[in-house]
Amino acid sequence: DGERWTASVAIEEGTSLYGTGEVAGPLKRNGRVVETWNTDAYGYQDDTASLYTSHPWVLAVRHDGTAFGVLADTTYRCEIDLRDGIVFRAVGPEQPVIVIDGDSPQDVCRKLGELTGTITMPPKWAIGYHQCRYSYDPADRVREIAQEFRDRDIPADVIWMDIDYMDGYRCFTFDSEDFPSPSQLNADLKDLGFHNVWMIDPGIKLEKGYSVFDSGTARDVWVKKANRTTTFEGEVWPGVCVFPDYTNAGVREWWAGLYADFMAHGISGVWNDMNEPAVFNTPTKTMPEDNWHRADEALGGPGDHARFHNVYGMLMVKASREGVMAANPEKRPFVLSRANYIGGHRYAATWTGDNSSNWYHVDVSIPMTLNLGLSGQPFTGPDIGGFAGNGDGEMFARWMGYGALLPFARGHTAKGNIDKEPWAFGEEVEATCRRALERRYRLIPYLYTLFRESSLNGMPIARPTFFADPTDMALRSEDDSFLLGPNLLVVAQLQPARDRVSVMPRPVEGVAWRELDFPSFDGGRDSKDPDQARLYVRPGSVIPTGPVMEYVDEDPLDPLTLIVWLDHEGKARGELYEDEGDGWGYREGVFRRSVYTAERDAGVVRVRRVAREGKMDDEGRGVSVRVLLPDGREATGFGRDGEEILIPIP
């Protein structure tokens, strides 16, 4: 009727529904109702209808393992009702509904990537571990945290600066007492092998004499009230604020330009928060829907906030990303955003927002990450340890035990809470965290290869366990475990004081998934830690791994360690992607893609590099091989990259 519309898609019996973006609750979405309306949802629970990002998208997997996806191409408020089939109910003028059919859920994910775009390769440091809190303050406290990681030999790559570094919460400023020299702080962090990320919000303090407010006012960049002439004012952290109208290209260009001086302080990455946009002391937690945006014709021309609310955050991070790239054109940008819209993964990673330190959020972090990945956002993860509240050591250990293996791994907590660094809960929990993070860093070669795959075809990095066999109905509701790429299964230990029994993928041609562990820093094996997630390797896989490092580019990948688990034919295959870790050389062919195979031949396993692509020089590095055996033992060998390596099998 011009004001609202409905679209329905019938589904066959036995069809499982997923996606719908950032949603709390189980992985399988059948019977659920959610609403796409970006919301500041602090401490959200299972029945919270709207969170921080909007993805009007449903992935449907039929009983036979074939799949289709449905995208309601609307930016307006939209209800997704999955109680009886797939129903979209949206306000605003009728918009297209796009259906993607595929032979498998993987096929549909790739086609969604073709439609909405894929991530750009992030800087390699962004795939390391991130440490954050609201807030590390003053600057010397930041230095203490960084030094503590190094003194305790716990791997980490990034320290984050929350809002308290600013002068009175004024964006693009620094507190002259607590952060007198951000350039020196960032240089000190760099000396310890750390990168840094600093927060920027959209709410700009209404204050004459504040340069950002003055320059924005001179250019008339602010969102207007319904009368289309008066600037909208709303309260956020600095007090009364005005808000840039990112729907306008000129405003985005102005915003991007603000990053030039900001990034010149040696800033590595940017965190855009509160960009739903959040507004305090209002029942809706945001600005009025009749506020007016002066959007470009490319976005359909001017319109009300009801139309642009769900893309406000995405357009902000698009502008932020452009500013970061202009300031550091030789580096890959890293931007994290709380609010986003489907397709916004091209501009920013995301996290699952202001979760809580309780066992519900330990459980729900896995399906939330997976459904975001199934909705086109692969670079995501939760606040490990929980943002709101404190929790206890066992909770933190079990959260880190699997959270360290999610695509985005960041510990974070709120102001006033107890400390939640890996060492904050005592020696036993610290040991679990160190094992978990050492495991992540051993797997960086494999993870980086998965990020490259995602950048090429849109596949999620963390994938639901049913991707191992979409025809296995027993896996359709399994959300205590997840796949990293196609070849590693992560089984989390979630419930307090006991092991969780998860549904495992069926053997492949009679060969079961094989448990994998690594040496622990204390001389044992990491799998003996009851809080550690369990790892399993798909039959027929070669997993590239590396040595433990304090940060991802501390040393060259030498030796490369290949972990082999043969299939029923005695064969295995795997890939490794490498590049410079930053910059754009890989787009000009400066990378190395290697394909490794293993094959049992009488009493030996032959390991070869059978393909090599790219201009990156061969290093002639050492290659260590671990062949996993059915009886729980291993056979090992060593050689040089590019040479055949023979491993005798006992």
Q: Where are the language model's segments positioned?
A:
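Extracellular structured ligand-interaction cores
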Residues: 52-56, 65-67, 75, 85, ...
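Catalytic core of carbohydrate-active enzymes
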Residues: 321-335, 339-351, 364-368, 372-382, ...
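A residue-level signal for conserved active-site and pocket-lining positions in enzyme catalytic cores
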Residues: 57, 108, 112, 149, ...
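Catalytic and substrate-binding clefts that recognize carbohydrates or anionic sugar/phosphate headgroups
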Residues: 1-124, 133-135, 139, 146-148, ...
